[in-house]
């Protein structure tokens, strides 16, 4: 029964487990952010079906948040039921690519469950980031824009293209 070094484990051709579990908050607060075997399989599916195709099309993908243990989710004010805690979601950007263009490409080409253009300001291509989840089975194909209004995060369905948001 050989112990696997999860830090260098490949999830797909260009993504490692360490990239998907890295958290400065977890390190600072001493929170265990290591996924179990089932969660690692879900992260592989996320990489193979979403992140790797995005990288193949656009180039470098900067993952800002991947797997978050329930304890980490609670520590940052997120939900214990977050798709990040289920190893089904990642937040990311592609350097030099407008986040609306990136989201529209994912919508048109990949089997996402939930796709959220987070805190994107139309006309500011570098604003915000993409939250995308993948699940086995039938995805919801939920396409949303998250934005701040009166100090709260609001969600609005995107009908058509994110690049047409006003």
Task: Describe these PLM feature segments.
Residues 4-55, 148-166:
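Extracytoplasmic cell-surface/polysaccharide-interacting catalytic and binding patches
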Residues 49-77:
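Extended, low-complexity, intrinsically disordered C-terminal regulatory tails
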Residues 62-64, 89-94, 131:
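Structural recognition of the beta-strand scaffold that forms the well-ordered cores
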Residues 75-85, 120-123:
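Short, flexible, solvent-exposed loop/turn segments with mixed acidic/basic and small polar residues
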Residues 81-101:
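Acidic, His- and aromatic-enriched active-site or binding-groove loops in soluble protein domains
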């Amino acid at each position: 029964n050989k112990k696997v070094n999860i830090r260098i484990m490949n999830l797909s051709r260009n993504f490692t487990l360490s990239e998907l579990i890295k958290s400065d908050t977890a390190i600072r607060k001493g929170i265990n952010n290591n996924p179990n075997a089932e969660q690692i399989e879900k992260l592989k599916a996320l990489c193979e079906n979403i992140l790797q195709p995005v990288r193949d099309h656009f180039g470098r993908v900067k993952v800002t948040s991947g797997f978050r243990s329930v304890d980490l989710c609670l520590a940052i004010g997120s939900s214990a039921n977050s798709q990040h805690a289920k190893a089904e979601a990642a937040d990311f950007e592609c350097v030099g690519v407008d986040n609306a263009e990136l989201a529209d490409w994912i919508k048109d080409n990949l089997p996402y469950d939930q796709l959220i253009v987070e805190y994107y300001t139309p006309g500011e291509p570098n604003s915000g980031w993409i939250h995308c989840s993948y699940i086995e089975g039938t995805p919801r194909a939920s396409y949303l824009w998250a934005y701040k209004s009166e100090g709260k995060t609001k969600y609005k369905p995107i009908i058509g293209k994110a690049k047409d948001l006003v």
